[in-house]
């Protein structure tokens, strides 16, 4: 029988607890009830993990001796240890809730998604984020766990929201804001297409401002400029100012990395006319009836 969490955790320093905390994300699977939201939810879980690992990288948690004592003297390190323990307990509680659900649920409700179920762009982002965290990680010390599943969106959002809140506290305890923003920029340095950046920006919303901002800035640099000095419409005419990235582009193989400039002086739309000042990527979108 494994030792109680309190005993094992008490023998570890913050660095050891932290690495085990980040590793907890690896054991979480998502149930089929997530449906079409699966990909976005998986990426939100990935981004919460990346943000937590980013804090560890920013404070050099695996190299700074302050984080290796099981009884730290530094007040900020004591606080960090308390917060990391809370995150571990959060996962422990969520796992227990899932286990109770499994006792009463039908077998068909316990089927989980796999990486292969993601669309190409989402799967590539998932793997990229996973590899990024792996490069930052040290070997864990707590007992290896078996995979377990979250079966509803509320449980997942509770985890990512609370992890984000805990990381907020960790970032406040250490003056590393500039470092974290730079690391976030580096994390998406090799992501060059608008569709991938748009997905990242959306998935990071509300849980990782640094990544969301970095993705938004990179999108602005990629898409170029679309402008019109004067736009007038009558009746049911429609004008779209800016690029259109359809669902087909977001979830397909399309890579959008061109920088364009589309500029007009005056647009007058009448009747049923439709005007796009920008580019459209993917199948049906703005022009659909």
From Swiss-Prot:
Spans annotated as Globular domain: 1-227
GO CC annotation: cytoplasm
Q: Does the keyword Transport apply?
A: no
A Pfam match is HeLo
Q: Which InterPro entries match?
A: HeLo_dom, HeLo_sf, Het-s_prion_dom
- What domain of life? Eukaryota
| Keywords (A to Z) from UniProt | Apoptosis, Cytoplasm
Q: Set out the biological process GO terms recorded for this chain's protein.
A: apoptotic process
Region described as Prion domain (PrD): 218-289
* Places the protein is found: Cytoplasm
Q: Which GO terms describe its molecular function?
A: identical protein binding
Q: Please tell me what else the database record remarks about this protein.
A: In P.anserina, the het-s locus exists as 2 incompatible alleles, het-s and het-S. Strains of het-s genotype (e.g. A, C, s, and V) can display 2 distinct phenoypes, the neutral (prion-free) [Het-s*], which is compatible with het-S strains (e.g. D, S, U, and X), and the reactive [Het-s] phenotype, which causes rapid cell death in het-S strains. Although the two alleles het-s and het-S differ from each other by 14 amino acids, vegetative incompatibility between s and S strains can be attributed to a single amino acid difference in the proteins encoded by the het-s locus.
Per UniProt, subunit arrangement is: Homodimer. Forms heterodimers with het-s.
What the entry says about domains is: The globular domain exerts a prion-inhibitory effect (in cis) on its own C-terminal prion domain. The het-S globular domain, but not the het-s globular domain, is essential for programmed cell death. The protein contains a prion domain (PrD), but beta-structuring in this domain due to incorporation into a het-s fibril induces a change in its globular domain, generating a molecular species that is incompetent for fibril growth.
Q: Which PANTHER family match?
A: HELO DOMAIN-CONTAINING PROTEIN-RELATED, PRION-INHIBITION AND PROPAGATION HELO DOMAIN-CONTAINING PROTEIN
- Main role? Responsible for heterokaryon incompatibility, a process that ensures that during spontaneous, vegetative cell fusion only compatible cells from the same colony survive (non-self-recognition). Interaction with the prion form [het-s] of incompatible cells triggers a lethal reaction that prevents the formation of viable heterokaryons.
Instruction: Report the protein name in the record.
Output: Heterokaryon incompatibility protein S
Organism of derivation: Podospora anserina (strain S / ATCC MYA-4624 / DSM 980 / FGSC 10383) (Pleurage anserina)
> What lineage is on file?
Eukaryota, Fungi, Dikarya, Ascomycota, Pezizomycotina
